[in-house]
Regions:
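N-terminal intrinsically disordered/low-complexity leader segments
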Residues: 1-11
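Helix-turn-helix
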Residues: 15, 19, 23-57
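Solvent-exposed, amphipathic alpha-helical segments
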Residues: 19-27, 72-76, 107, 148-155
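Alpha-helical DNA-contacting segments of helix-turn-helix folds
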Residues: 59-66
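Hydrophobic alpha-helical connector segments
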Residues: 68-105
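Short alpha-helical scaffolding segments that buttress acidic/His motifs in well-ordered protein cores
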Residues: 89-93, 104-111, 145-152
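Conserved, surface-exposed functional patches that form binding/active-site neighborhoods
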Residues: 96-105, 109-125
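Hydrophobic/aromatic-rich alpha-helical bundle segments in the mid-to-C-terminal region
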Residues: 115-122, 126-169
Length: 169
């Protein structure tokens, strides 16, 4: 947050998303409201609504930010076929899991309750599936590895493997 003498505090859209992420990590997705974000950022509700018209818009922006970061990790590595791709997917998942906890995951689960958000997520996964396509044994093994990674991710974010014994891969 930036302050100037004689003026109310101002904060950028990205700054608000940073504060929103912190709120979710500390208090969970249900604590993320326009009012709570305004209070945490030290600005008015109108200041938040200037950047995010609704809570849904705010949550969608958070998920888009996370997805963009994850996609950037995938695209940073040149991949030649399903095996290389799944290796980069595993590395990106490992990196992103270090920043993810059950409270953040709860927000993502609630995000998927909206049919439009679910459609967007399905479209994202279709892009992943396309990169794992093929009839070769390597492509099939890459798909099995993908399913295993996704299963480990679900165990971790749902708090089933609290100590990370099974999900530390």
């Amino acid at each position: 947050m930036r302050k100037t003498v004689g003026r109310k505090p101002t904060i950028t859209r990205d700054g608000l998303l940073d504060v929103a992420e912190e709120l979710v990590r500390e208090q969970g997705g249900s604590a993320l409201t326009i009012g709570a974000l305004a209070k945490a950022a030290g600005i008015s509700k109108g200041g938040v609504q200037y950047s995010f018209a609704s809570r849904d818009d705010l949550v969608r922006s958070l998920v888009a930010r996370w997805t963009t970061r994850f996609d950037a990790m995938l695209n940073d590595v040149a991949t030649d076929g399903p095996v290389d791709f799944i290796r980069s997917y595993i590395a990106a998942t490992r990196t992103s899991q270090q920043a993810m906890d059950a409270k953040t995951a709860g927000l993502m689960v609630s995000y998927l309750e909206n049919p439009e958000h679910l459609r967007e997520t399905r479209d994202w996964y279709r892009g992943i599936f396309d990169r794992l396509a093929g009839a070769s044994p390597d492509a099939q093994a890459a798909r099995v590895a993908f399913l295993a990674v996704e299963g480990l991710f679900l165990l971790r974010i749902n708090g089933i493997d609290e100590n990370g014994v099974w999900t530390s891969f």
